[in-house]
């Protein structure tokens, strides 16, 4: 049976997508703002955990109160995979823009509602139950938030600037933390700790609603990403009708054909988010509860660290466009393995300057991960399953990473060893290193299932020329390999004359 050879049309200049700079800026702003609001809540919750422990879990000793409050923080991560599957399938069916508008609505309302919950003294057991329900609603919406936002930015970004553009997404995360922590410190300082415990802790959560409305306005005004529009345009009419009728996503296909990418995604997210939650969510509680600093003192140190991270974040993304994503994952993992214990030795030194230095070491390591994560993850999967695959893998990983504050607090309480969080980070560093070694480089390459994307016509011509040069090099390599095989064949014939018989 003769196989029919399929002709592939060579790529032309018209096939390179020119990204409009104005739309790109709007896309990054809208995505980063929603992400900032997500982490604003995480920041506020981490920094007021001591207050929530007393409001919702009275009667327990301070250690149990802290673990209970942080456990309430961690439980919603059990819901995130469900949100990831739900919003991921819808995002591949209806597009990224619509889903991101929905997630920010749910997230802002549920965060706002936390500030409305009465204390345990007023409604008893219903207080922690309502808190848990609000956190679960957050977890469900966040299941589609970060992955959708990272895909949105990646599909809008030029290939050569995807690392830099993607880094602004986690810039928004850190900025959200800074805002949340700053608001907590400001309110606590202005009204005093007594009033803050009584009612002041509610005020930061009320800010979520206006922030959410701003984010909704920005996201609603955006167009769908170029990559998703290309995907829909390529579909035949029957396939397009099928797309509207139901999600065209096969999770069996994702698990069987993209399992390597799933493992890379899981490993990178675990390494990044465990470090994230350890530094930015657990550390304020560690400084106040384990090292006995005042709450405001510990928060101010973390705020200073995060402000420094804001300046480093886009630099990491910019450098990753030049040197690739793999080096940052590998170097960051090695650094974390060898510096985790020294950094905690500095943090436990009881000297402010050394404490700051220890936290700064962890922050730079975290920047190495966050600087490349938002640009690396979307590049692992093709357009038609990108949201579903990424949301599923990401939220399974976050399910593990989200337990970090609770696990770290429990390890310290049960062992009375202040270095247990450092040992935990060393284990995570091994996961990060294996991920970095086995992941494929994605920098300066088109997203799977999409045409090349450029900032302007000049860059498009350069990309096209590089593409043609690569084809010529591949042809030359194939020709050389054929010549080498022919030479080996001739040698075998000379050694074994009967081989031609």
UniProtKB/Swiss-Prot annotation:
The keyword Lyase does not apply. Residues 1-38, 88-98, 144-170, 217-261, 320-326, 372-391, 439-501 are cytoplasmic. Residues 60-66, 120-122, 192-195, 283-298, 348-350, 413-417 are periplasmic. It is a multi-pass membrane protein. GO terms for biological process: amino acid transport. It is found in: Cell inner membrane. Its main location: membrane. Residues 461-495 form a coiled coil. InterPro entries: H+-coupled_symporters, MFS_dom, MFS_sugar_transport-like, MFS_trans_sf, MHS_symport, Osmo_CC, ProP_C, Sugar_transporter_CS. Induction: Induced by osmotic strength and repressed by osmoprotectants. Expression is not affected by the growth phase. Belongs to the major facilitator superfamily. Sugar transporter (TC 2.A.1.1) family. Involved in uptake and accumulation of various osmoprotectants. Allows the uptake of glycine betaine, proline, ectoine, and pipecolic acid. May be a contributory factor in the infection progression within the host. This is Glycine betaine/proline/ectoine/pipecolic acid transporter OusA. The lineage of its organism: Bacteria, Pseudomonadati, Pseudomonadota, Gammaproteobacteria, Enterobacterales.
